[in-house]
Curated annotation (Swiss-Prot):
It is an enzyme of class 2 (transferase). Homodimer. It comes from Idiomarina loihiensis (strain ATCC BAA-735 / DSM 15497 / L2-TR). The gene is glyA. This is Serine hydroxymethyltransferase. GO terms for cellular component: cytosol.
Length: 418
């Protein structure tokens, strides 16, 4: 018999210790991985609820199981809030991840072997935008576009040239490591010229879009996909939305999610999404996203003043790439040194990177998490200076130790969950 007082600590000490160690790491380390964030206790309450027990294959009011009247209500709330948040006419909240949202979108708009355009992984795209090791590059004919080397911005002329040459079924706009503002209207213009669908993957900027501080792709794209974590700060999961009136496309999208590539939805995660969407509709969420941008720019300016090269010479969103080629530092070594200083980053390829993806010559930094715990410009500048202190001599253990103690002291002043 199950008892409400059951807990992990008393039953599985090894697992509990690992969980507590991760809690301590999150509290004591500065999180600068651009795709990570801290979700709210309300979201975690939803994810730890008894909704996890319910199987609900199908969609609200059209289920294959009984007893779904309350999870129907939960999913309806999530759908309506997602539509309100992004100005969409359609939403599917069931994808378990951004990658599965992309998989479903591809299935709805293409057949195996069809051609699509996507941003090159080496220039800031995502695995699901056509990488040869991913389903998107294996099942479909992926053609990659990249950045204009002189500006560090998307090469729209190349996108149009490739579109005219290959006549793709779908053009994918979106990124995992691009610090500029994407011209969604230009992408739609190119897509219309070749009678292609425009799909936007806004996983990285969804929170910024929701707050109105980054252009909304919904009015331009046929289909928009996103994760619900990252800047949106919700549970780990995916979402598909559309501003289109094309009900045939909506039905294809629903069928591609279920039964196309998923079975039962995760009702507890959908509840977490509903909570996160409600949080994102509040005025303070816009203030948060504005500060994310301010903090990112403060870090960029500080690092540039210290002699570090920033790809595209700045940022217009929550992330930026540090090019370490001229410093003769690998991204792998920089990642490790900063990790020892309790500053968590991720190594990342930069344009024309001479090193392998496992080594790289750059770092990707983002400010959603530090802003979520209350950092403002002064703290962002301080963190940027600490990064430079470590990178100036990554073999200096005394400097790393000094920065680590400073990081721990700052984190103690700004607890993630106060």
């Amino acid at each position: 018999m199950l008892k409400s007082e059951m807990n992990i600590a008393d039953f599985d000490a090894d697992l509990w210790q690992a969980m507590q160690d991760e809690v301590e790491r999150q509290e004591q380390h500065i999180e600068l991985i651009a795709s990570e964030n801290y979700t709210s206790p309300r979201v975690m309450q939803a994810q730890g609820s008894q909704l996890t027990n319910k199987y609900a294959e199908g969609y609200p009011h059209k289920r294959y199981y009984g007893g779904c009247e309350f999870v129907d209500k939960v999913e309806d709330l999530a759908i309506e809030r997602a539509k309100e948040l992004f100005g969409a006419k359609y939403a599917n909240v069931q994808p378990h991840s951004g990658s599965q949202a992309n998989t479903a979108a591809f299935m709805a708009m293409m057949e195996a072997g069809d051609t699509f355009l996507g941003m090159s992984l080496a220039h800031g795209g995502h695995l699901t935008h056509g990488s040869g090791v991913n389903f998107s590059g294996k099942l479909y004919n992926a053609v990659s576009y990249g950045l204009d080397e002189s500006t560090g911005e998307i090469d729209y002329a190349e996108v149009e040239k490739l579109a005219q040459e290959h006549k793709p079924k779908v053009i994918v706009a979106g990124f995992s490591a691009y610090s500029g503002i994407v011209d969604w209207a230009k992408f739609r213009e190119i897509a219309d010229k070749v009678d292609a669908y425009l799909m936007v993957d806004m996983a990285h900027v969804a929170g910024l879009v929701a707050a109105g501080v980054y252009p909304n792709p919904v009015p331009y794209a046929h289909v928009v996909t996103t994760t619900t974590h990252k800047t949106l700060a919700g549970p780990r999961g995916g979402l598909i939305i559309s501003g289109s009136d094309d009900e045939k496309l909506h039905k294809k999208l629903n069928s591609a999610v279920f039964p196309g590539n998923q079975g039962g939805p995760l009702c507890h995660v959908i509840a977490g999404k509903a909570v996160a969407f409600q949080e994102a509709l509040q005025p303070e969420f816009k203030d948060y996203q504005k500060q994310v941008l301010v903090n990112a720019n403060a870090m960029v300016k500080t690092m540039q003043a210290r002699g570090y090269k920033i790809v595209s010479n700045g940022t217009q969103n929550h992330l930026f790439l540090v090019d370490l080629i001229d410093k003769d530092i690998t991204g792998k070594d920089a990642d490790a040194a900063l990790g020892n200083a309790f500053i968590t980053v991720n190594k990342n390829a930069v344009p024309n990177d001479p090193r392998s993806p496992f080594v790289t010559s750059g770092l990707r930094l983002g400010t959603p998490a530090i802003t979520r715990r209350g950092f403002k410009e002064a703290e962002a500048e301080q963190v940027a200076n600490w990064i430079c202190d470590v990178l100036d001599d990554i073999a200096d253990e005394s400097k790393i130790n000094q920065v680590r103690e400073q990081v721990k002291a700052l984190c103690a002043k700004f607890p993630v969950y106060g």
